């Protein structure tokens, strides 16, 4: 599909599912960046003994993809010390907009529009979007596997994505992961579909 100029997307339950697509985009030989919307950094080399897990997807993408120029993480609010060390030692290949930093700047008067401009400015011209639904506030996705207090409203993410499209950057692929409807409600699926 990519050879036909199509934008390929992956809908997965667990966040490790898009690694194959990210590697396929990398195999085209052109630099690209990843916009990761997530509560977690996903930079662990392994999680509970598994090297291919939802907690390792971005670690593996950085390790396997030689054309991945920049990883821009947005909304991260649950991070291990080892992941912070990876971010710090990445020579600016990883730029993380932590949830608490974004919120503190807003409390001090910075607008979401200004923050979105900063986020988009960090991205190269070709962008892959990786959206783990737990990047949203937990009341919007209470049944996801690892909800974390804090996060975004849906309209904030929609604004970010619209502004990314308006910026002239080329979207080369995307994923939406960790959407898990509950036993008594399809609320999470409804939010994920929007």
Predicted segments with their positions:
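Conserved alpha-helical scaffold segments that buttress catalytic/binding sites
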Residues: 1-194
């Amino acid at each position: 599909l990519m050879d036909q100029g199509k934008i390929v997307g992956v809908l997965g339950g667990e966040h490790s599912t898009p690694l194959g697509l990210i590697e396929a985009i990398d195999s085209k030989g052109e630099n690209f960046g990843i916009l990761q919307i997530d509560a977690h950094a996903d930079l662990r080399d392994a999680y509970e003994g598994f090297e291919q897990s939802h907690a390792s997807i971005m670690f593996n993408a950085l390790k396997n993809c030689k054309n991945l120029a920049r990883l821009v993480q947005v909304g991260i609010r649950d991070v291990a010390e080892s992941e912070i060390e990876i971010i710090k030692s990445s020579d600016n290949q990883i730029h993380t907009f932590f949830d608490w930093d974004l919120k503190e700047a807003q409390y001090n008067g910075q607008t979401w529009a200004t923050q979105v401009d900063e986020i988009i400015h960090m991205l190269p011209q070709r962008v892959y979007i990786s959206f783990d639904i737990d990047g949203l506030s937990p009341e919007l996705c209470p049944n996801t596997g690892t909800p974390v207090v804090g996060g975004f409203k849906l309209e904030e993410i929609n604004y970010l994505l619209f502004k990314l499209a308006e910026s002239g950057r080329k979207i080369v692929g995307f994923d939406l992961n960790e959407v898990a409807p509950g036993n008594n409600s399809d609320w999470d699926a409804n939010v994920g579909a929007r």
